[in-house]
């Protein structure tokens, strides 16, 4: 299904797209929703870290729907056209121009979205001292930070 190595730089465009569609997006969606629910639940037992958990929840309430929307646009707009380009190249054919001018337009938008999410998770990393729980933290808070670090 996928190459044995995880050196993505050696993968073909088609292999990368398939990996994202079959693995990265489904797992990202599932983990994102689980993490957001976990953060909401952790609010109940956060104790001294409640103010931090509130900010984590606030950011995840924005991030997870944004990620879902981003994934949807990649799946509906970007990837189908890239697959069409790959097929045309393999068959040495030409295809019609992208419907909104150039494929670079949605790519730039999506790259900006990636940068915004990186900033958001950078903020959470700083807020949580690199996802490190203080000694007195609850087990739920420790688990939330560990899962958030894995998600990022």
Regions found by a protein language model. Name each.
Residues 1-152:
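Small-residue-biased structural context
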């Amino acid at each position: 299904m996928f190459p044995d190595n995880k050196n993505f730089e050696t993968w073909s465009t088609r292999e990368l797209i398939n990996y994202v569609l079959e693995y990265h997006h489904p797992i990202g969606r599932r983990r994102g929703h689980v993490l957001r629910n976990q953060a909401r639940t952790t609010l109940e037992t956060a104790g001294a870290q409640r103010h931090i958990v509130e900010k984590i929840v606030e950011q995840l309430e924005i991030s997870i729907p944004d990620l879902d929307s981003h994934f949807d646009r990649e799946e509906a707009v970007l990837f189908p056209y890239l697959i069409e380009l790959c097929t045309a190249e393999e068959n040495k054919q030409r295809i019609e121009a992208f419907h909104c001018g150039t494929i670079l337009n949605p790519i730039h938008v999506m790259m900006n979205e990636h940068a915004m999410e990186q900033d958001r998770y950078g903020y959470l990393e700083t807020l949580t001292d690199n996802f490190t729980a203080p000694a007195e933290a609850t087990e739920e808070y420790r688990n939330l930070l560990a899962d958030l670090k894995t998600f990022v």
